[in-house]
């Protein structure tokens, strides 16, 4: 009798499952997806593993045929798709096919969400054979008991869930491949659009505009320091004057109030004592885990999901992509037993705490929890420190969610002083309850003990402290709060949040600074154009409804191709109109805002333009016929608009107060340096609003305050410049093109040696040859055709020795390093980011041996890393 083949999608998951299955099973990994829609027009070849069984036809030589070839899916012919084995996965597929031929049965044990279902379906389609040979097994946690139960009751592939995943993929493909070329034509090359990503960018853009339109308003608060009859200190805040909320808007009003308060008599009007409770939060779902990891651990969404994936695959937590707060009965019994044994009965509620899941959540799924509550974070020796921290957070939330409420005695004191009312609030913890395992992030102002005073007691004024404040604009999104907003609006699902957050940053429409989102100007322009021409596509409710439609497909409540057809019909109508000229209702181009600045080359006026790389000045003569065209541009150096995280929550308000306001629409203006004598202030709503101002004076680029830098090649001074990739130092000698980077710490990068061509060393992945380059992370070999070929690798010491005479003097010591370790393994040059020094190490079969040598006091010394 042969063995059964079990296929999972990750090697780590395969390793864990293998521990629980006997010798009758062979567990192998597909290493993620094995096939997908083509990345180029190669779909025209229609590979043998296509989902279609029709005879391959020669593609028509028209635009539609070419588009279908590129997309790999044909929305005009019943959504016929052409899947291809992913590059590099041929060997994996071949091995799985060979194992499948020998296997008695094949178990598809990929993840339990739609993505996992789709991977399982692709595996079955590619491997082939009788469908009866395949079984689908799913489990919420990788434990011995869960694995045994899953294999005792295997099921079949859920084709509805597969179709829901395909429908999402096809819609995203259509939008990306059909709208992006329109953006290239109308706005700028290299732009892209996405069905969900563009809506997420809209959220960031709208928040950016709310912030720029916000005008901070001044207001004042007055605190009073008093003492009680027994001499205890009592801090109060003025809340009312003449029974109206106290909110003076300037210093004069505040001083008038202070004068009255200084003469008033203070007495306690009311003391209110009442018990309050604080209930624990629900166990984590994907979005709340991402938010808690951001707030408590400082993790980004991508890092959180990567750590959670590793914990799941190692068997330590349940599946991490879920929107259900449901807990299995076994899990509830387990944690209640743990609470009773370790904290006592007073921490255990009479009945389990229940939490409501949102509408459309997958109740069959569980919340994210530890597989075994008795396993502590410190015992996860095979996990990295960040994974242990995330596990501890999940463990704490799981245990806390089934504990009793925390109990407090809350006190409110109301004090009278003439026409004024003052208040003080305090809270005393009487029973810690769930906070014993999940402490609060920080104590609020109420978490203080108020002195024992009663109604009628007189207080003595010690000091009045007026403080100026300004109203704050809406807070910028963090990764976690953007996920929360997407979830609230029903956009995306647990399995897509992380990819949405990553994609909108990769596209260059937004950026993250100090863990907060900023909209790029091109992101604003693209959002405006898409909103004007694709209202449904950019509509929050429509996007949420489409998510619901996909849920219906997964639940066998809707036919997937009917959903796609309805979407495509509306979409193509909008696309056809958008492709027309603006006069006919088509998409507006990326217009220039003309200025009074003269072109230094031809004298025509320069205009404010926006490209993917940022805002710049371009000559209006660029629109002329080729022979008359002027291509002159002027780089604009943006003022440092990134907020200093150390400034705290007032940073955004302070930045807005410092900005100029557009004379036409009142929006905060963005400021740029044209040259050392001119600064350009551009309306934050540019190019929709053409407001701008030119300021003259003496200016310089912020970013380098060190000593004068001398060019190492010609001896001239180097000055700070701003380019498409940021700030750099450039030689002032026009004949010398030398430049040097500005490092993150603000220092000028040390001089780098010129590349050394090594035509004797051919590249493996192209016809190029290697050159030896000196970079920020030491020397490395790179293709001479960069960026066409991006092949790089570390140089072998024996290679450097071979070409020692070509190396600059500064690098020749590397050629003198040991060429082999004591075991005869070849050595290569590496760079330590910790010490900023180069060293050599050896490898065997692609893995580090642990041997290394370091250059110390003019000689090479062997030593362990």
Curated annotation (Swiss-Prot):
Residues 192-197 are annotated as: Interaction with DNA. Disulfide bonds: none annotated. Belongs to the type IA topoisomerase family. It holds the Pfam family Zn_ribbon_Top1. Mg(2+) binds at residues 9, 111. Monomer. Residues 3-142 form the Toprim domain. Changing residue 365 to R: Increases DNA binding affinity. This is DNA topoisomerase 1. The record marks 33, 168-169, 172, 177, 184, 321, 507 as: Interaction with DNA. InterPro entries: TOP1_Znf, Topo_IA, Topo_IA_2, Topo_IA_AS, Topo_IA_cen, Topo_IA_cen_sub1, Topo_IA_cen_sub2, Topo_IA_cen_sub3. Releases the supercoiling and torsional tension of DNA, which is introduced during the DNA replication and transcription, by transiently cleaving and rejoining one strand of the DNA duplex. Introduces a single-strand break via transesterification at a target site in duplex DNA. The scissile phosphodiester is attacked by the catalytic tyrosine of the enzyme, resulting in the formation of a DNA-(5'-phosphotyrosyl)-enzyme intermediate and the expulsion of a 3'-OH DNA strand. The free DNA strand then undergoes passage around the unbroken strand, thus removing DNA supercoils. The gene is topA.
């Amino acid at each position: 009798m042969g063995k059964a083949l079990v296929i999972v999608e990750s090697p780590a998951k395969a390793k864990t499952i293998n521990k629980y299955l006997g010798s009758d099973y062979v567990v192998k990994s597909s290493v993620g997806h094995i096939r997908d829609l083509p990345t180029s027009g190669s779909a025209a070849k229609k590979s043998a593993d296509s989902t279609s069984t029709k005879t391959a036809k020669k593609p028509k030589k028209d635009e539609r045929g070419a588009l279908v070839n590129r997309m790999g899916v044909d929305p005009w012919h019943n959504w016929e798709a052409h899947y291809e084995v992913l590059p590099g996965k041929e060997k994996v597929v071949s091995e799985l096919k060979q194992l499948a031929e020998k296997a008695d049965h094949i178990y598809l044990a990929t993840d339990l969400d739609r993505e996992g279902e789709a991977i399982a379906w692709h595996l079955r389609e590619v491997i082939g054979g009788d469908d009866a040979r395949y079984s689908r097994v799913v489990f919420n946690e990788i434990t011995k008991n869960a694995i045994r139960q899953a294999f005792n009751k295997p099921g079949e592939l859920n084709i509805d869930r597969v179709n829901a995943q395909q429908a999402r993929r096809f819609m995203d493909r259509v939008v990306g491949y059909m709208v992006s070329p329109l953006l290239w034509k109308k706005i700028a090359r290299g732009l892209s659009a996405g069905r969900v990503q563009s809506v997420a960018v809209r959220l960031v853009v709208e928040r950016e505009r709310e912030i720029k339109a916000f005008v901070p308003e001044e207001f004042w608060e007055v605190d009073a320091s008093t003492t009680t009859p027994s001499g205890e200190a009592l801090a109060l805040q003025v809340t009312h004057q003449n029974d109206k909320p106290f909110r003076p808007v300037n210093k004069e009003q505040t001083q008038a109030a202070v004068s009255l308060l200084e003469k008033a008599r203070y007495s306690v009007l009311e003391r209110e004592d009442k018990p309050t409770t604080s209930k624990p939060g629900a166990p984590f779902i994907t979005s709340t885990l991402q938010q808690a990891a951001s707030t408590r651990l400082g993790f980004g969404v991508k890092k959180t999901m990567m750590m959670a994936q590793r914990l799941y695959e190692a068997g330590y937590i349940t599946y991490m992509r879920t929107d259900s707060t449901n807990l299995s009965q076994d899990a509830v019994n387990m944690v209640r037993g743990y609470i009773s044994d370790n904290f006592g009965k007073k921490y255990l509620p009479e009945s389990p705490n229940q939490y409501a899941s949102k509408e459309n959540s997958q109740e069959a799924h569980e919340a994210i929890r530890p597989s075994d509550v008795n396993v502590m974070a410190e015992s996860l020796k095979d996990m990295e420190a960040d994974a242990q921290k995330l596990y501890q957070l999940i463990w704490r939330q799981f245990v806390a969610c089934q504990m009793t409420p925390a109990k407090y005695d809350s006190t409110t004191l109301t004090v009278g002083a003439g026409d004024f009312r003052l208040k003080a609030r305090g809270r005393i913890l009487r029973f810690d309850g769930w906070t014993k395992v999940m402490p609060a992030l920080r104590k609020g102002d109420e978490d203080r003990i108020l002195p024992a005073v009663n109604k009628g007691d007189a207080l003595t004024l010690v000091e009045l402290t007026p403080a100026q404040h300004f109203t704050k604009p809406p807070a910028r999104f963090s990764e976690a709060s953007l996920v929360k907003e997407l979830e609230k609006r029903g956009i995306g699902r647990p399995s897509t949040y992380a990819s949405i957050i990553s994609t909108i940053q990769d596209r260059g429409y937004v950026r993250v600074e100090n863990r907060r989102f900023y909209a790029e100007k091109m992101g604003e322009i693209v959002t405006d154009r898409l909103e004007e021409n694709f209202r449904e596509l950019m509509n929050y409710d429509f996007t949420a409804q489409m998510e619901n439609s996909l849920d219906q497909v997964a639940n066998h409540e809707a036919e997937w191709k009917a959903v796609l057809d309805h979407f495509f019909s509306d979409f193509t109508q909008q696309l056809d109109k958008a492709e027309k000229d603006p006069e006919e209702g088509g998409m507006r181009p990326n217009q220039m805002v003309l200025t009074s600045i003269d072109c230094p080359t031809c004298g025509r006026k320069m205009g404010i333009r926006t490209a993917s790389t940022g805002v710049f000045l371009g000559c209006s003569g660029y629109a002329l016929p080729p022979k008359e065209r002027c291509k002159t541009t002027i780089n604009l150096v943006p003022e440092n608009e990134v907020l200093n995280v150390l400034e705290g929550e007032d940073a955004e308000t302070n930045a807005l107060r410092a900005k100029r306001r557009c004379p036409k629409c009142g929006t905060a203006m963005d400021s740029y340096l044209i040259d050392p004598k001119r600064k350009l202030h551009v309306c934050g709503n540019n190019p929709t609003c053409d407001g701008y101002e030119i300021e003259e004076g003496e200016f310089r680029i912020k970013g380098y305050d060190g000593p004068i830098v001398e060019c190492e090649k010609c001896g001239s001074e180097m000055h700070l410049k701003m380019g498409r990739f940021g700030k750099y130092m450039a030689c002032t000698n026009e004949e010398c093109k030398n430049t040097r980077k500005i490092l993150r710490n603000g220092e000028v990068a040390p001089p780098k040696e010129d590349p050394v061509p090594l035509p004797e060393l051919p590249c493996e992945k192209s016809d190029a040859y290697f050159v030896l380059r000196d970079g920020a992370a030491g020397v490395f070999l790179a293709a001479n055709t960069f960026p066409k070929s991006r092949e790089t690798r570390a140089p072998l010491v024996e290679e450097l020795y071979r070409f020692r005479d070509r190396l600059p003097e500064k690098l020749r010591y590397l050629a003198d390093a040991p060429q082999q370790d004591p075991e005869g393994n070849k050595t290569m040059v590496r760079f330590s980011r910790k010490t900023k020094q180069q060293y050599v190490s050896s490898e065997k079969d692609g893995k580090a041996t642990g041997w290394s040598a370091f250059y110390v006091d003019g000689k090479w010394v062997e030593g362990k890393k």
